[in-house]
Every structure is written in C-alpha cells, then in structure tokens.
Design a protein with these regions (language model features):
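Core catalytic lobe of class I
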Residues: 1-253
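Short, conserved SAM-binding/catalytic segment
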Residues: 255-261
C-alpha cells in the first residue's frame, strides 16, 4: 500500500485498519470547502475551479460530518503518541452573494467539531508564511492574505506524551531536560509548480520543514495527496510514505514528479 493509492482516503484508511497497520504521522491539506467549484461547466472552466474532479461545495453540515468521520479514521490508524498536521485556511470566495454565506467561519467550525466530537485536541498552531501573498483585489475590506495555518492535532489522552522531533539541548544536574527552540512560524513557498489539476497544493519545502519538526518514526500518510508534494519530501528524506488521491490525473502527475527525483 505504500506510495500513491488512486482511491478515496476513507477506502485507504479502512484497508490500513483491516490490515492492523498504523501510521506514524498524518500530514495533509484537505479540501477547504470554500465553494469555489461548481457543477456549472462554465464555472468549472474558469480560475474558480480548484480541483480537476472534486466539487468543493458541500454544505457546512455535510463538511463538518465528513471531517468528523475523517478524524475518527485517523484515530483508528494513528500510532500511539502520533500527530496529525492539518493545513487549513479561511475562505476568500467573493463570488457568492448569498447573505448567509460566511466563508471565514468554516475553519473555526471544523476546529470546534474536531475538539468536541473526536478523540483529538489542538496541541499547537503553526503559522505558514507564504512567499507570495494571495490578493483580494475584488474586496474593499478584506486584507491581503499572506499566511495559512497548520494545526497540530493530538489525542486528548496523549497531550502530555505526544512526540516531536525536538532535540535535547542540555540536561541539568537535577535531570531536567532542556530542548532546542522550535518556533511555530514557518516560511515556505506556496507550491512547487502551478498546474491545472489542483490549484490548492502546498510546497514540498513546507513538508520538509514540518517533517523536521514532527517526524520521529513510522509511515507518513497524506489522505489528500494531490500532485505529490508530501511524497516528494518524504522521498528526499528517505521516509516511507502513503497517500490517497481520487483523481487519476493527479496520481499520474505525482508519479511523474517522483520519477524525476
């Protein structure tokens, strides 16, 4: 099962569970459900289409239920003291004119749902400063977005024992350990390369920095592999990895990237 699996992540998670396997770290960026995509063919052919086949337009209720099920799946396959690194951001869709449309709320609703209805809580929040800002030229009151967030989820029962890659810097005579400073601020490129298949990818540079902070052992799993940035970074470090991706075209794109390494 290692490598890219061209299937829904829930199928992959079930297979991992059925085989009695565990992953050491989950690192991913899910669809944000910003509603930019549409079943309208004219809209799908514009810049608003973020993915080649996924319609990023669930209702908030559907998206929250979907996220809850996803984290229940993570709980079933993540090893003891493992970590979930979950990149999310708020919406920027200004094309939706419905009065009740509030794109900024969904990220916080997701966090609330995860910490109240699953085994996980937030241990840390990493600010990812991108090299290129995302403009808001069509908005008179929204600021230009330069950062996204990576939420560090761990099991509530493991909040004091979950593992990071922080190294011991010194040990006092009393036995007290002092660790190196690892800051919750990361600067990395937006993505590795632009493509029409997925306009919401993160860069392998970001993945490399996150792995340096949190990877300790085991297989890294990305349930939304996209064009392969997580796999590329893991290959560069000699780390075993596993990914799921529903788009056949994106899987082929990722495999070609990996062959170029």
């Amino acid at each position: 099962m290692l490598g890219i699996n061209n299937e829904d992540c829930f199928n992959t998670i079930q297979k991992i569970q059925d085989q009695g396997r565990k992953v050491g770290l989950v690192l991913t960026s899910p669809p944000y459900n910003t509603g930019r995509n549409s079943t309208d063919i004219k809209r799908r052919d514009t810049h608003e289409a973020r993915y080649d086949i996924h319609l990023d337009n669930m209702t908030d209720s559907e998206y929250l239920d979907w996220t809850t099920a996803l984290f229940h799946g993570f709980d079933n396959i993540l090893r003891k003291n493992g970590v979930v690194l979950y990149n999310m951001s708020y919406g920027t869709d200004t094309t939706n004119t419905k009065e009740d449309y509030k794109p900024n709320e969904i990220m916080y609703k997701v966090i609330n749902r995860v910490i109240t209805e699953t085994a996980f809580t937030i241990a840390d929040t990493i600010v990812w400063k991108k090299s290129t800002a995302l403009p808001n030229n069509t908005s008179k009151n929204k600021l230009t977005r330069l950062c996204e967030f990576v939420y560090v989820f761990v099991r509530k029962s493991e909040l004091k024992s979950f593992e990071t890659a922080k190294k011991v810097k010194s040990v006092a005579k009393t036995g007290q350990k002092f660790y190196e400073n690892v800051y919750n601020f990361v600067e990395a490129r937006n993505n590795d390369r632009t493509n029409k298949l997925n306009k919401a990818t993160f860069s392998s540079e970001l993945v490399l920095k996150l792995l340096d902070m949190y990877y300790t052992k085991g297989v890294v799993y990305d349930p939304f592999m996209g064009t392969g940035s997580t796999g590329v970074a893991c290959e560069m470090l000699g780390i075993k990895w596993l990914g799921s991706e529903i788009s056949t075209a994106q899987c082929e794109y990722a495999r070609k990237r990996l062959e170029e390494l």
